[in-house]
């Protein structure tokens, strides 16, 4: 299976998926930490992929997603966005709705 197929499978098999640097318990950058904090506040469970230990995903996902940065939040197979968008949605109090409705 090539890396794009792996990415597609990860996205399709997880309702809420976060591509991030590190893990939810040990984020390796401030953007990933802020995104994890917002997601945890929603109370929804989510899967994650550590792009630091998956260099092929780190290299290929930005082109596949047409989104250049990490973290990337995917909900129900759709890219929601990165840290800035997640933070903005969260500050409006709409993150739980965005996560559940997608």
What are these regions (language model features)?
Residues 1-9:
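Short N-terminal or domain-adjacent regulatory/targeting segments
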Residues 8-45:
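Local sequence-structure signature of Cys/Sec-based thiol-disulfide redox active-site neighborhoods
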Residues 19, 72-76:
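Acidic beta-strand-to-loop metal/phosphate-binding motif
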Residues 38, 48, 60, 72, ...:
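Residue-level recognition of specific faces of alpha-helices
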Residues 44-58, 68:
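Thiol-based oxidoreductase modules, predominantly thioredoxin-like and allied folds used
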Residues 63-69:
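Thiol/disulfide oxidoreductase modules built on the thioredoxin-like
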Residues 75-102:
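Non-catalytic, surface beta->alpha helical segment in thiol-disulfide oxidoreductase systems
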């Amino acid at each position: 299976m090539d890396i794009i197929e792996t990415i597609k499978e990860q996205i399709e098999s997880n309702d809420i998926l976060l591509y991030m640097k590190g893990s939810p318990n040990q984020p390796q950058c401030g953007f990933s930490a802020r995104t994890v904090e917002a997601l945890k506040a929603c109370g929804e469970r989510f899967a994650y992929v550590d792009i630091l230990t998956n260099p092929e995903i780190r290299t290929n996902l930005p082109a596949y997603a047409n989104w250049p940065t990490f973290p990337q939040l995917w909900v129900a197979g759709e890219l929601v966005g990165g840290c800035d968008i997640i933070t903005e949605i969260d500050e409006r109090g709409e993150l739980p709705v965005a996560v559940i409705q997608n």
